Amino acid sequence: MSSRSTKDLIKSKWGSKPSNSKSETTLEKLKGEIAHLKTSVDEITSGKGKLTDKERHRLLEKIRVLEAEKEKNAYQLTEKDKEIQRLRDQLKARYSTTTLLEQLEETTREGERREQVLKALSEEKDVLKQQLSAATSRIAELESKTNTLRLSQTVAPNCFNSSINNIHEMEIQLKDALEKNQQWLVYDQQREVYVKGLLAKIFELEKKTETAAHSLPQQTKKPESEGYLQEEKQKCYNDLLASAKKDLEVERQTITQLSFELSEFRRKYEETQKEVHNLNQLLYSQRRADVQHLEDDRHKTEKIQKLREENDIARGKLEEEKKRSEELLSQVQFLYTSLLKQQEEQTRVALLEQQMQACTLDFENEKLDRQHVQHQLHVILKELRKARNQITQLESLKQLHEFAITEPLVTFQGETENREKVAASPKSPTAALNESLVECPKCNIQYPATEHRDLLVHVEYCSK
């Protein structure tokens, strides 16, 4: 009865297998949730999946559920630890066995160490969640920056191409203006040479007219015989002078026209020079703008390279975090196996306690049986001593009585005495023990001394 009660108590304290199956299902669920989180983190790191608000909300809900499960498991562990402490106190109060206490202390220390490891794992899990949120925000920032840089890169080449086209057009116009300027310079030089030649001819004709004018009065003073020749010469000179004057007028007109054209060409040349200067300034400013634009592009490329390096570093950190999460999963699995081993050890300890209680009960029962048998033997020995004393007294009285009887009866008395001696001789202790009776103190049922075990069973049944 007592052994059954202890078994039931141990079963009620330690629980049964459904709780273990429930904890296993919760652990499997946690493993599935962690695997799903790993896949989502892999999708984020690979850049294939972009987190929407709905998915982020769903992940936050899953994280909250996991935290609730973690708190629930922690509460269950604390309750089990309290139960273990209470059972240990009960065992310490009931039994003074040092080995069991040492084993229980070792198991409690192991449980405390595992609780510390679980706390550390939960803290690392929180850190991983924070790093994951920071990494997702950083990836979102990097994606927005890369999109803006791509847009700027698509806009910048168009502007650069248009500016390059404008520069090429301006260079072509400048080359045309320089060629025209060179042609105008050559033409101007040729016109100056031509004008100088005309002026020299005009100067020579003027000299000839002057010499002809000085020679006319001298020729009139000559004799009239030479008059006809002189008139002919005068006509020739007049014709030459008129033609020279006409040529001079024509040349003067051409000179004025050429000077006007020269002034026009100079004005155009100055305008072209101004245009060339303006184009040079515009080209210089355009080149400076292009250099600035190229410098900005270089800075942008450096920034893009830096962002790519930061992205690579973030991916490396994510890989490290993935490895750490895998290590944590392996540690969780190891802890799960160790918890299973601990539960097996606890069941073994419970079985050992049960066996020890059964052994102690059997020992107590045997001790009580032995004490009762010793008491019965002591009583039987006392009764045996009393019987022996009574027999000796009766024998002495009988001998005195037989001495008073007549002599003829001596022989018959001797025979009867021998018979009585044989009959009254002390029996062996085993025979006396077999003939002695033991009775129940409650219902007064008698049992032989050899059947003392049956008497004990009867007493236990009768005392109920």
UniProtKB/Swiss-Prot annotation:
Consequence of substituting residue 428 to A: Partial loss of phosphorylation in mitotic cells. Complete loss of phosphorylation in mitotic cells. Remains associated with the centrosome throughout mitosis. Arrests mitotic cells at the midbody stage
Keywords noted in UniProt: Cell cycle, Cell division, Coiled coil, Cytoplasm, Cytoskeleton, Developmental protein, Disease variant, Mitosis, Phosphoprotein
Outcome of mutating residue 396 to A: No effect on phosphorylation in mitotic cells
Effect after changing residue 188 to A: Diminishes interaction with PDCD6IP
Residues covered by region (Disordered): 1-26
Coiled-coil residue windows: 22-186, 238-337, 374-403
Entry's Gene Ontology cellular component terms: centriole; centrosome; cleavage furrow; cytoplasm; Flemming body; intercellular bridge; membrane; midbody
Superkingdom as given in the UniProt entry: Eukaryota
GO BP of this protein: cranial skeletal system development; establishment of protein localization; midbody abscission; mitotic cytokinesis; regulation of phosphatidylinositol 3-kinase/protein kinase B signal transduction
Chain intervals with Basic and acidic residues compositional bias: 1-11
UniProt modification remark: There is a hierachy of phosphorylation, where both Ser-425 and Ser-428 are phosphorylated at the onset of mitosis, prior to Ser-436. Phosphorylation at Ser-425 and Ser-428 is required for dissociation from the centrosome at the G2/M boundary. Phosphorylation at the 3 sites, Ser-425, Ser-428 and Ser-436, is required for protein function at the final stages of cell division to complete cytokinesis successfully.
Residue spans crossing the bilayer: none
Region (Required for localization to the interphase centrosome and to the midbody during cytokinesis): 355-464
Annotated stretches, region: Interaction with PDCD6IP: 160-214
InterPro entries hit by this protein: CEP55, EABR
Chain residue ranges for the region called Interaction with TSG101: 157-236
Location of Phosphothreonine modifications: 430
Pfam families named among the record's database cross-references: EABR
Subcellular location(s) of the protein: Cytoplasm; Cytoplasm, Cytoskeleton, Microtubule organizing center, Centrosome, Centriole; Cytoplasm, Cytoskeleton, Microtubule organizing center, Centrosome; Cleavage furrow
Residues with PTM Phosphoserine: 96, 425, 428, 436
Tissues expressing the protein: Expressed in embryonic brain. Expressed in fetal brain ganglionic eminence, kidney tubules and multinucleate neurons in the temporal cortex. Expressed in adult brain, cerebellum, kidney tubules, intestine and muscles (at protein level). Widely expressed, mostly in proliferative tissues. Highly expressed in testis. Intermediate levels in adult and fetal thymus, as well as in various cancer cell lines. Low levels in different parts of the digestive tract, bone marrow, lymph nodes, placenta, fetal heart and fetal spleen. Hardly detected in brain.
Quaternary structure, from the entry: Homodimer. Interacts (phosphorylated on Ser-425 and Ser-428) with PLK1; the interaction is indirect via the MTMR3:MTMR4 heterooligomer, occurs during early mitosis, regulates the phosphorylation of CEP55 by PLK1 and its recruitment to the midbody where it can mediate cell abscission. Interacts with AKAP9/CG-NAP; the interaction occurs in interphase and is lost upon mitotic entry. Interacts with PCNT/Kendrin; the interaction occurs in interphase and is lost upon mitotic entry.
Disease with which this protein is associated in UniProt: Multinucleated neurons, anhydramnios, renal dysplasia, cerebellar hypoplasia and hydranencephaly: An autosomal recessive, congenital disease characterized by severe hydranencephaly with multinucleated neurons, renal aplasia or dysplasia, and hypoplastic kidneys. Hydranencephaly is an anomaly leading to replacement of the cerebral hemispheres with a fluid-filled cyst. MARCH results in death in utero or in the perinatal period.
Function according to Swiss-Prot or TrEMBL: Plays a role in mitotic exit and cytokinesis. Recruits PDCD6IP and TSG101 to midbody during cytokinesis. Required for successful completion of cytokinesis. Not required for microtubule nucleation. Plays a role in the development of the brain and kidney.
Name of the protein this chain belongs to: Centrosomal protein of 55 kDa
Organism encoding this protein: Homo sapiens (Human)
